[in-house]
Curated annotation (Swiss-Prot):
Induction: Up-regulated following myocardial infarction (MI) (at protein level). Peptide hormone that functions as endogenous ligand for the G-protein-coupled apelin receptor (APLNR/APJ), that plays a role in the regulation of normal cardiovascular function and fluid homeostasis. Functions as a balanced agonist activating both G(i) protein pathway and beta-arrestin pathway of APLNR. Downstream G proteins activation, apelin can inhibit cAMP production and activate key intracellular effectors such as ERKs. On the other hand, APLNR activation induces beta-arrestin recruitment to the membrane leading to desensitization and internalization of the receptor. This is Apelin receptor early endogenous ligand. It is found in: Secreted; Secreted, Extracellular space. GO terms for biological process: angiogenesis; apelin receptor signaling pathway; cell migration involved in mesendoderm migration; coronary vasculature development; embryonic heart tube development; endoderm development; G protein-coupled receptor signaling pathway; heart development. Its main location: secreted. The keyword Hydrolase does not apply. It comes from the Eukaryota. It comes from Mus musculus (Mouse). The keyword Secreted applies. Disruption phenotype: Mice lacking APELA are not represented at the expected Mendelian ratios. Mutant embryos exhibit around 10% to 50% incidence of incomplete penetrance of embryonic lethality. Fetal death is increased especially in mothers devoid of all Apela expression. Mutant embryos show extraembryonic tissues anomalies, such as ectopic anterior chorion, mesoderm yolk sac and blood island protrusions and reduced allantois thickness at 8.25 dpc. Expressed in the placenta. Expressed in syncytiotrophoblasts of the placenta labyrinth at 10.5 dpc. Expressed in placental chorionic trophoblasts (at protein level). Expressed in a small population of epiblast cells in the distal half of the embryo at 7 dpc. Expressed in newly formed definitive endoderm cells in the proximal half of the embryo, while it is not present in extra-embryonic endoderm at 7.5 dpc. Belongs to the Elabela/Toddler family. Residues 1-23 form the signal peptide.
């Protein structure tokens, strides 16, 4: 019967590790949204265009 308390200690320890690892830091840099042509700018067609006019 010594196995059950040891199991509960391990289970609570594993759940606390999962809970701590899921939290993100406050100053975590968010991924910027990519628009067309994998560009960060919303209207980037003139930048990637092969013609001299937009």
């Amino acid at each position: 019967m010594r196995f059950q308390p040891l199991f509960w200690v391990f289970f609570i320890f594993a759940m606390s590790l999962l809970f701590i690892s899921e939290q993100k830091p406050v100053n975590f840099p968010r991924r910027r949204k990519l628009y067309r042509h994998n560009c960060f700018r919303r209207r980037c067609i003139p930048l990637h265009s092969r013609v001299p006019f937009p």
